[in-house]
Amino acid sequence: MSDTLRRLGEVLESRKLANGGDPEKSYIARLFHKGDDAILKKIGEEATETVMAAKDARAAGMTDEARGKVVYEVADLWFHTMVLLSHFDLTPDDVVNELARREGLSGLEEKALRKSQARDAAGD
């Protein structure tokens, strides 16, 4: 995992209310204080902004400026997703490990496996 993601994960942990994060002084601590709905709302907003930036970039002919806007919005989305992970006591490593688990497994195989597991769990 990149050092940047690791450091960001550490900052997020330090902003938790239990670790002394102050909602009056820290945007991250304020999100933690507001809870799940506030964090999820931000993720929804950032996901929508990412979609719009991507559509705009394609319409603009993938100029450097438009591509930069996509990167900017994806960074916001990643950031707020990492806030959610931290809020749920998960880390970027948990996501990296899941991606590693999926490596070499086609999307179609993954989908079929999930369907099979769901049927097994339902007792079918």
From Swiss-Prot:
Disulfide bonds: none annotated. InterPro entries: HisE (IPR008179), PRib-ATP_PPHydrolase-like (IPR021130). GO terms for cellular component: cytoplasm. It is found in: Cytoplasm. Keywords: Amino-acid biosynthesis, ATP-binding, Cytoplasm, Histidine biosynthesis, Hydrolase, Nucleotide-binding. Pathway: Amino-acid biosynthesis; L-histidine biosynthesis; L-histidine from 5-phospho-alpha-D-ribose 1-diphosphate: step 2/9. It comes from the Bacteria. Belongs to the PRA-PH family. This is Phosphoribosyl-ATP pyrophosphatase. It comes from Ralstonia nicotianae (strain ATCC BAA-1114 / GMI1000) (Ralstonia solanacearum). The gene is hisE.
